[in-house]
Amino acid sequence: MSDQSVPSFRWVQSLKRGLSVWTTPVKADVLNDTRALLSGLDFSKVASVQRMMRRERRDDNDLTNLRDNLKEVDSLMTMRSSQKNMFLKVGSLSKDELMELSSDLNKLKEKVQRSERIIGGSGVYQGNFTTTHLTRRSEILQLVGIQRPGLNRRGGVVKIWDIKEPALLINQFGSTPAVTISCMAEQGGETLNDVVQGLTDLGLLYTAKFPNLGDLEALSNKHSCLKVITQEESQINISGFNLSLSAAVKAGACLVDGGNMLETIKVEESTFTTIIKTLLEIKSKERMFVDITPGQRNPYENLLYKLCLSGEGWPYIASRSQIKGRAWDNTVIEFDVSPRKPPVPIRNGGSPVLTTLKPEVEEQIKRSIESLSVHDTTWIDIEGPPFDPVEMAIYQPDSLKYIHCYRKPNDVKSFKDQSKYCHGILLKDIEFARPGIISAIIKHLPKSMVFTAQGSEDIRRLFDMHGRQDLKIVDVKFTAEQSRVFEELTWKRFEHLCDKHKGIVIKSKKKGTTPASTNAHCALMDCIMFSGVLLGAIPNDKPRRLLPLDILFREPDTTVVL
């Protein structure tokens, strides 16, 4: 997706709105830490680190000095991240959401590793290049035969660490507002109040646009304290002791009250999963993405990395130099369900059989599926979301065979909304649907079987959630009007095949579209009518049910009053 432009500021605004409930007023905390640093930090050592970071090449001694200074900073601050690895499982996040998160973290991992690649042998760490350095370096590498013409590498400024353990560099970069403010005050010879005023104005500007070097120069005429900020383009891996524009903007964001700034988000173990879920929803709405091309992170990538690095604290502004690992190391995604508890022994020996379906029911399902022809056109449709389906149908028009079943929903509120605007199924009619039938059907489907569907996304998710990535889906992609050409005829001819769609369905009209039908959506009827569109006619003969009705529902529990 490297060719896609990123509307960075719009993304930031959307993230601010969507995550505003987790933003916190941090000005007082930041200034308390700033005062602690002004009192306890040895700024001669800070100056030494700053000089070291301006050199083109650094060694193990330089890294030791950097890490020692960051440890001192961490010990003086109260706003610091603590190591807290997070484990995400199916439950509060759906399997689909976990798969999306896992994919994004893997892409982010590839981007970061390509941006901070190891070159020239073990222990030589390189940051990124400016365009000028890139051009000159490419010419030299081509001259000596190391790089082929046309091989493009881009990034920030050349930074080489000639060290034995590159892993020690992890989490030693990035700015902290308390450090930025204290350095501006102490090293710039300014009062703390003047620095706060100048950075507050910079933060206010940030609520309307991304401040650039021109904006910085203009604000410096009003606030002389801002003149100590480096007049250079942002770099990827620079010390938090460097007074860069991005560091100043971050500090300013913390000083703006009521701005719901992303920089002020606070994460706790109890809120982590909800924040991640909300982030994925915002991502989908704004069509955000992870771009694996080396370079600066876009707003979504930046927030995702910071959230997943440490599960507690302020991911943007806290001291995190003592955190070990990267985002993809510290947020673990587990797709497997929790192991079943061992069976409880029964009195006369042995243990109860803990299965969802009785063996005879599962065997009947297996025989029904074996009656399908693997090579015939096979339609499939579901009602309800893929993570909570309430109806599923499989239909083969050549033989007129079909499998049709129901499932009681977990989310009753969402089910009632879907009933009103879509399928018209009443909860009381499927309350005693035998659990586990849909899963058993999917489990026993022949390997690599091909299905036809009108809209494949939900079916794909349903199959993937059951570990059936081998099943194939052909999406016919009819328009809404095309798909329902035979709707009235199908219901008139075959409504006796399904009596579970008794509810009233309300027309739902989206802006710019024709109002939907008020006929209920039945998975079986939909399969028959969609097939009819392709064949040009609806069959006269009655389709044949493969799954007996008596196994679709269980007997309701009875209460005996003594």
Swiss-Prot record:
Task: Mention any Pfam family matching this sequence.
Answer: Arena_ncap_C
Going by the UniProt record, its keywords in alphabetical order are: Capsid protein, Helical capsid protein, Host cytoplasm, Host-virus interaction, Hydrolase, Inhibition of host IKBKE by virus, Inhibition of host innate immune response by virus, Inhibition of host RLR pathway by virus, Interferon antiviral system evasion, Manganese, Metal-binding, Ribonucleoprotein, RNA-binding, Viral immunoevasion, Viral nucleoprotein, Virion, Zinc
Q: Which residues bind Mn(2+)?
A: D381, E383, D526
Q: Which GO terms describe its cellular component?
A: helical viral capsid; host cell cytoplasm; ribonucleoprotein complex; viral nucleocapsid
According to the lineage, what is the superkingdom?
Answer: Viruses
The family database entries (InterPro entries) matched by this protein are listed as:
Nucleocapsid_arenaviridae, Nucleocapsid_C_arenaviridae, Nucleocapsid_C_sf, Nucleocapsid_N_arenaviridae, RNaseH-like_sf
Subcellular location per UniProt equals:
Virion; Host cytoplasm
Q: What class of enzyme is it?
A: hydrolase
Q: What is its EC number?
A: 3.1.13.-
Which parts of the sequence bind Zn(2+)? E391, C498, H501, C522
Which residue stretches belong to region Binding site for the cap structure m7GTP?
A: 53-238
List the residue(s) that the UniProt entry marks as the site Important for exonuclease activity.
D458
Q: Which GO terms describe its biological process?
A: negative stranded viral RNA replication; RNA-templated viral transcription; symbiont-mediated suppression of host cytoplasmic pattern recognition receptor signaling pathway via inhibition of IKBKE activity
Family, per entry: Belongs to the arenaviridae nucleocapsid protein family.
State the HAMAP family in the record. ARENA_NCAP (MF_04085)
Q: What does this protein do?
A: Encapsidates the genome, protecting it from nucleases. The encapsidated genomic RNA is termed the nucleocapsid (NC). Serves as template for viral transcription and replication. The increased presence of protein N in host cell does not seem to trigger the switch from transcription to replication as observed in other negative strain RNA viruses.
| Quaternary structure note | Homomultimerizes to form the nucleocapsid. Binds to viral genomic RNA. Interacts with glycoprotein G2. Interacts with protein Z; this interaction probably directs the encapsidated genome to budding sites. Interacts with protein L; this interaction does not interfere with Z-L interaction. Interacts with host IKBKE (via Protein kinase domain); the interaction inhibits IKBKE kinase activity.
Any notes on this protein's domains?
The N-terminal region is important for the cap-binding activity while the C-terminal region contains the 3'-5' exoribonuclease activity. A CCHE zinc binding site is present in the C-terminal region and may thus contribute to the substrate binding and/or the specificity of the exonuclease activity.
Q: What is this protein called?
A: Nucleoprotein
This chain's source organism reads Tamiami mammarenavirus (isolate Rat/United States/W 10777/1964) (TAMV)
Q: What is the lineage of its organism?
A: Viruses, Riboviria, Orthornavirae, Negarnaviricota, Polyploviricotina
- Gene name linked to the record: N
